[in-house]
A protein has these predicted regions:
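Conserved NAD(P)H cofactor-binding loop of Rossmann-fold oxidoreductase domains
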Residues: 79-84
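Rossmann-fold cofactor-recognition segment
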Residues: 44-57
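SDR active-site lid
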Residues: 160-231
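Substrate-binding pocket helix/loop in short-chain dehydrogenase/reductase
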Residues: 87-88, 95-100
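Active-site helix of classical SDR
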Residues: 111, 147-150
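Residue(s) in the substrate-gating loop at a strand-loop-helix junction
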Residues: 131
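Conserved glycine-rich cofactor-binding loop
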Residues: 12-13
Length: 264
């Protein structure tokens, strides 16, 4: 599948930027969507557009204006996201809504705008980057786990509705070495329990030992290249291959015990 025009959310850093670079290297015209496009410089075929995905009204306006100004893309990658690390009793109310908007509502709205147009043009792929956290939730990140799980379920629902020219990919990505943890809103350290501190150290360890964003971007591109709908696991060998298999044979209570032991 030749990708002429692509939209990538969260395309100024980490996995999003790596996806943009992968597409640009293959001759695709790329539109990177982010809150702070000034972080990087535009260049030939690389367009930087400003959008706050927590503002649902702005997301709807963006969908309409993009179609009018640039036309229908061949590829939409809903990559933008972040995790917030809090005990549930301390989780800020505004952060709850913001995470739902960024992780779930905005990707769904963008799909609503672009999927019908892709069908009309007879080709298109939508990649929704979910997470291995749909199977193995992260402690103290309940809204991240919930948002990614819901996005995964939404993508699978779209696979039921669409066939033929429009492809849907639920890409469940494991840990990738990015600045994800550095940018995460966190409960102030002096109020964190000992169990929170230990969980955060384990999450940091996993991230630091993970594959690069460039590695993940290549996996994502290869999934697009297959031109098929489906659920795909990405990341290092254990998380992409063994963890999904292990999950199939693990009872729910057993899973909770394993996760509590890992993050204790």
């Amino acid at each position: 599948m030749k990708i002429k025009k692509a939209i990538v959310t969260g395309g100024t850093s980490g996995i999003g930027l790596a996806i943009c670079e992968e597409l640009l290297s293959r001759g695709t015209e790329v539109y990177s969507i982010s809150r702070n496009p000034e972080k990087i410089k535009p260049r030939e075929n690389f367009h930087l557009l400003k959008l706050d995905l927590s503002d649902l009204g702005a997301v709807s306006d963006f969908g309409s204006s993009f179609l009018k100004e640039y036309g229908t893309p061949d590829l939409l990658v809903n990559n933008a996201g972040y995790g917030a690390f809090y005990e549930w009793k301390e989780f800020p109310d505004d952060e709850i809504q913001r995470q739902i908007n960024v992780l779930l509502s905005s990707p769904i709205i963008l799909c609503k705008f672009f999927a019908p147009k892709m069908e009309l043009q007879g080709k298109g792929t939508i990649v929704n980057i979910s997470s291995l956290a749909t199977l193995y939730p992260l402690p103290y990140m309940p809204l991240y786990n919930a948002g990614k799980s819901a996005l995964s379920s939404f993508t699978q629902s779209m696979m039921l509705e669409h066939s033929g020219s429009l492809k849907w990919i639920d890409f469940r990505l494991g840990d990738i070495r990015t600045s994800f943890n550095e940018s995460a809103p966190k409960q102030i350290e002096k109020s964190q329990s000992e169990s929170m501190n230990r969980a955060w150290l384990q999450i940091e360890k996993q991230l630091n030992e993970s594959p690069s964003a460039k590695f993940a971007a290549r996996q994502i591109y290869q999934s697009i290249k297959k031109n098929k709908s489906g659920t795909i696991f990405g990341g290092g060998f254990f998380q992409a291959k063994l963890a999904p298999l292990f999950y199939r044979f693990l009872p729910f209570l057993g899973l909770i015990k394993v996760l509590k032991f890992r993050y204790r």
